[in-house]
Design a protein with these regions (language model features):
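Flexible "arm" and connector segments at domain edges
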Residues: 1-63, 67-108
Length: 108
């Protein structure tokens, strides 16, 4: 599925099952909540914390939840994420083309 297809699929789902998008500010709060849930799994899986009894390692599910809300925000604010990602990659390539090549911390 492309990013464009994902944006379209989310939009169809919202119109069919969700009635309407939550407000932009509500979705921003929901995105923050979902990023926190992703951070919790990351801390338990890769950090110093351990999973609580009954908690599951659902890293992919939490990432998908973050992506879902980001797609909602893009749709409701008129952002074409495919185009914006292309621009972001071009910007990073120009800005960072040589930035990390000689970083001794990255050479293991």
């Amino acid at each position: 599925m492309t990013i464009k297809e994902a944006q379209e699929a989310v939009d169809r789902w919202i119109k069919e099952y969700g009635v309407r998008y939550f407000s932009e500010l509500t979705n921003m709060a929901v995105l923050t909540e979902e990023v926190g849930e992703l951070a919790r799994v990351m801390a338990r899986k890769y950090g110093d914390q351990s999973f609580k009894e009954g908690e599951k390692d659902n890293l992919g599910e939490e990432m998908a939840d973050v992506l879902w809300v980001l797609l909602c925000l893009a749709n409701q604010t008129g952002v074409d994420l495919t185009e914006e990602l292309k621009k972001s990659m071009e910007k990073k390539t120009q800005r960072d083309a040589l930035r990390h090549i000689h970083n001794k911390k990255l050479m293991a």
